[in-house]
Amino acid sequence: MKERYHLLDALRGFAIYHVIIFHFLYDVYVVYGLNLDWPYQTWVQLWQRNGCGLFVLVSGMVFALGRNTFKRGLQLQILGLIITLATYVFAPSEVIYYGILTFFGSAMWLTLLVKVFLQRIPAILGMLASVVCYVLAKDVAMGVASFFGRKLFEFPEWLYQNCFAILGFHSNTFYSSDYVPLLPHIFLFWFGMYLFAWLRERKLTHLLTGGNYKIFTWPGTHSLEIYILHQPILMGLCYVIFGRTP
């Protein structure tokens, strides 16, 4: 019987709670127009970034388990495409291009493609390199690579076309209500992968078997289904609260 890492399930469940609460408030304040400036507040952006980051990091750790990763990546890519088409048709003002599901599918495939090279890097060095690369790439949307606020160089302007949006480069006309590009998030995904490898090397993975609290582990083990269903349910709830469509 395979060992279950309950702490990973719990962390993923915690992250999905974050997603539900954040999207409910987004629907109330932005979609229903109560406060259109809400998503631009500093604390909201930090909340969104940290919640997304936790999801990505944990997913990188789960990827290291190596369970049906290609098939899982394909499933996520298809679901991401369906969400893009659905929002484009039924909610064009909140259309989603390259959202979190598309990112996970792309991250899995890209990692599989270069896995033979990544595995040659010692886990501790891989974690360190992932952190450095994440910091360097976090301002790619602003056209620069920086290191703790110090600009190192500018990316070529020709990169900033919408055809490269999945990578993190896009024009000023690009919009997506849920946008998780490969840069810088792939490095957080790889950090999670190397973190699990480091724990496994030191025989510390038993630390991940604790935390079996159903309130977190249950949604963690059903995170994909919950993610797909939560937004239609939230929009239905908002319709009941406000008595109208947006």
Language-model-detected regions and their locations in the chain:
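Alpha-helical transmembrane segments and their immediate juxtamembrane cytosolic regions
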Residues: 1-246
